Every structure is written in C-alpha cells, then in structure tokens.
Amino acid sequence: MTRSLKKGPFVDHHLLAKVEKAVATKDKKPVKTWSRRSMVLPEFIGLTIAVHNGKQHVPVYITDQMVGHKLGEFALTRTFKGHPADKKVQKK
C-alpha cells in the first residue's frame, strides 16, 4: 500500500538538515546516513548519500529518476553467493 498523498513524503529531520547544509556549502563529500526509510526528495539531486546497509555505508549518487523512492532501495543488504554445488555430481 502506498503512502497517502495528504501526508506527504517522509524524511528524517537530521538527514534533511545534513542535506541542506551540504547544498548551502556546496560540499562534495558523501552525506552519511543510517536512515534507509527516508524518501528521496528533489533537493537531493546531484548529491552523494552514503546509505548504511547493516555493515558499511554504500555511496549512492542521487539522480532525478530516484525521486520518490526510499534510500534503502539503493543499498542492498543481502549478498547472494550462489547455491552450493551438488555433492552427488562431483563423485565422477
């Protein structure tokens, strides 16, 4: 179910403050955040946001196509290493 339009997008206040400061100072360093639940706003375009995936911060460059999505969608939390090889086949 999508979020109601009358509520508006959710962005953590501390993240919004960091982004506004980075835009005002034209800082190119990644903005480090743990807030995967925050929505990408148009003010974020052109910034690099380091989103925490549970282990490390993954740098995500924000483009106009990402607006409206959540930051957590761009920092994967699980790594798939493939299914284990079948033991019966290796007996040859």
From Swiss-Prot:
One of its GO terms (molecular function) is rRNA binding. It holds the Pfam family Ribosomal_S19. The keyword rRNA-binding applies. InterPro entries: Ribosomal_uS19, Ribosomal_uS19_bac-type, Ribosomal_uS19_CS, Ribosomal_uS19_SF. Keywords: Ribonucleoprotein, Ribosomal protein, RNA-binding, rRNA-binding. One of its GO terms (cellular component) is small ribosomal subunit. The keyword Membrane does not apply. One of its GO terms (biological process) is translation. NCBIfam families: rpsS_bact. Belongs to the universal ribosomal protein uS19 family. Protein S19 forms a complex with S13 that binds strongly to the 16S ribosomal RNA. This is Small ribosomal subunit protein uS19. It comes from Paracidovorax citrulli (strain AAC00-1) (Acidovorax citrulli).
